Amino acid sequence: MHFLNFFNHLAIKNPMRFKLLLVFFMICHTCFAQQKTVPVIFDSDMGPDYDDVGAITLLHAFADSGKAKILATIASTKFEGVAGVFSVLNTYFNRPDVPIGVPRGKAVTQRDWQHWTDTLLANYPHQVMRNEDVPDATELYRKILAAQPDKSVTIITVGFFTNLASLLQSRPDKYSKLNGRQLVQKKVKRVVSMAGKFPSGKEFNIEKDAAAAQLVFKTWPTPIICSGFEIGEKIKTGLPLIHNAAIQNSPVKDVFRISIPMDKQDSAGRMSWDETAVLVGIAGYGPYYTLKPGKVVVADDGSNTWVSGKGNHAYIVPRMEIQKVQELLNDLMMHQPSRKE
């Protein structure tokens, strides 16, 4: 029987078996597709919380294994020093020349209350000293995207939607004759975001710039996969890292060493929201998660609701045991620099 005829026959005669087979093929396709090197723009608030540091560590670990190519690391906040923090971490992982961007316009300025950013800037080498030393975030997005193959770039955003909204609203420039939405449609394969609480709720990354999140979820032209608050809340990481005596002079270890003891709720490790977005963005969602397709709707107050069915959005649902995902993330967060420039 012809392959397509077989599927049509199966869909009519045995709908349940057809659905299971379809899910199997989707998972296989996702896993196969993710075997290639994934070109990534990493967009992070890098400051109010410290799971961003775990996330960028995963990013560099995947890059060292050939699974990711880091095109840029971009801040969605603009507290003074955020560019330097990115520079510290990129330099530590032997990628000091990865482009860094910071928003020039209106943006959140909230930073870490534990002051681990000050420790990194005072104790580790970095080339970037001031936010003014790096390009505007939107300009850098346009420059990087314009130079990439069509439908190739994965944007992993683990902060606010400030930059993505600005990118959508950007006008043609010296890098591309396309406006922002056209450029995204042409160059971006998908967005994977740590954002929202599902099926409904209020979550920090959306709430802090709700207007930007509304614009992105209403008008972004390519698929968006969300790792919601409920996913990372259950995954605790960082203790194996800070107890590993073999890891010395590590900014990543210092961040978790400083921060975990300062909050009783972190006694078993820090909740790991941002790391899950990097895992899905580069390794794929299977076998760790399944996808719930539909549409994210953001209210004016930053709360989100979910409309199941057709839509360009999806949120992840646990598939693998949480403990196994936790062990994987803890292992990746102990990754040491292995690539020399």
Predicted regions and their residues:
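Bacterial Sec-dependent N-terminal signal peptides
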Residues: 1-37, 341
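N-terminal acidic, glycine/proline-rich low-complexity segments
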Residues: 34-341
